[in-house]
UniProtKB/Swiss-Prot annotation:
The chain crosses the membrane at residues 13-33, 69-89, 97-117, 138-158, 179-199, 201-221. This is ATP synthase F(0) complex subunit a. One of its GO terms (cellular component) is mitochondrial inner membrane. Component of the ATP synthase complex composed at least of ATP5F1A/subunit alpha, ATP5F1B/subunit beta, ATP5MC1/subunit c (homooctomer), MT-ATP6/subunit a, MT-ATP8/subunit 8, ATP5ME/subunit e, ATP5MF/subunit f, ATP5MG/subunit g, ATP5MK/subunit k, ATP5MJ/subunit j, ATP5F1C/subunit gamma, ATP5F1D/subunit delta, ATP5F1E/subunit epsilon, ATP5PF/subunit F6, ATP5PB/subunit b, ATP5PD/subunit d, ATP5PO/subunit OSCP. The keyword Ion transport applies. GO terms for biological process: proton motive force-driven ATP synthesis; proton transmembrane transport. It comes from Xenopus laevis. It is a multi-pass membrane protein. Disulfide bonds: none annotated.
Length: 226
C-alpha cells in the first residue's frame, strides 16, 4: 500500500472514533492534578507557571474590559502550543494542521472582538477611515479597510495551518531521503540526519512561536476594539 505525504494530515478513525477527538484531549491529560506530586508533574507545573507568567505580559497594554480576555487567550495559547508540540512526536496526529479547526478558533474570537467594537457605533466606524484622509480617497480607503477587517480571521487560520503543514512535510521529506540514502550513501545519509535534527529543533521553535503569534494577533485586534 502506497502512502502519500499528505496522509499524515488525514484524521484516522479508530473504533468509529475520529483520532482528532482523542488528540484534542491530550493537552488536558498533561495538566497535573493537585494530588499528584511526583517529579515529572512538579516540573510540568513549573513550566506551565513560567509560560503563564511570561505570556500574560502581552495583555498589559489592554484596557480593563480587555483584561477579562486574559484567561481565555492564555488558555488558548497553552492549548495551541501543546497541540503543536505533541504533533511533532512520531505517529501522532496534529489537529492544528486542519484549517477547519484553526478557522473554528479564529472566526468566533475575531467576531467577538468586532461585536465588542460595534457597541459604540461611531467608534467602530472610525476604524474604517484613518484620520486626516483626503476626501477623494475616502471611498477607496473604506473599501480597503473593510476588506482587511474581514480577512483577519482567514489570515489567522491560514497562517497557522500553512506553517505547521509545511514544517511537517519538510521533516517527512528529509526523513525519507535519509532512510533511502542510508544503504546507498551512508555519509550523505548521516549529513541528512543532522539536517533533520536541526530542522526538528526549528519546528519545535515554530510550534511555540505560531501559538504565540496567533494569540498575539488576537490581543492586538482586541486592543483596537476595547
Amino acid at each position: 500500500m502506497n502512502l502519500s505525504f499528505f496522509d499524515q494530515f488525514m484524521s484516522p478513525v479508530i473504533l468509529g472514533i475520529p483520532l482528532i477527538a482523542i488528540a484534542m484531549l491530550d493537552p488536558f491529560t498533561l495538566i497535573s492534578w493537585p494530588i499528584q506530586s511526583n517529579g515529572f508533574n512538579n516540573r510540568l507545573i513549573t513550566l506551565q507557571s513560567w509560560f503563564l507568567h511570561n505570556f500574560t505580559t502581552i495583555f498589559y497594554q489592554l484596557t480593563s474590559p480587555g483584561h477579562k480576555w486574559a484567561l481565555l487567550l492564555t488558555s488558548l495559547m497553552l492549548l495551541l502550543m501543546s497541540l503543536n508540540l505533541l504533533g511533532l512526536l512520531p505517529y501522532t496526529f496534529t489537529p492544528t494542521t486542519q484549517l477547519s479547526l484553526n478557522m473554528g478558533l479564529a472566526v468566533p474570537l475575531w467576531l467577538a472582538t468586532v461585536i465588542m467594537a460595534s457597541k459604540p457605533t461611531n467608534y467602530a466606524l472610525g476604524h474604517l477611515l484613518p484620520e486626516g484622509t483626503p476626501t477623494p480617497l475616502i471611498p477607496v480607503l473604506i473599501i480597503i479597510e473593510t476588506i482587511s477587517l474581514f480577512i483577519r480571521p482567514l489570515a489567522l487560520g491560514v497562517r497557522l495551518t500553512a506553517n505547521l503543514t509545511a514544517g511537517h512535510l519538510l521533516i517527512q521529506l528529509i526523513a525519507t531521503a535519509a532512510f533511502v540514502l542510508l544503504s546507498i550513501m551512508p555519509t550523505v545519509a548521516i549529513l541528512t540526519s543532522i539536517v533533520l535534527f536541526l530542522l526538528t529543533l526549528l519546528e519545535i521553535a515554530v510550534a511555540m512561536i505560531q501559538a504565540y503569534v496567533f494569540v498575539l494577533l488576537l490581543s492586538l485586534y482586541l486592543q483596537e476594539n476595547v
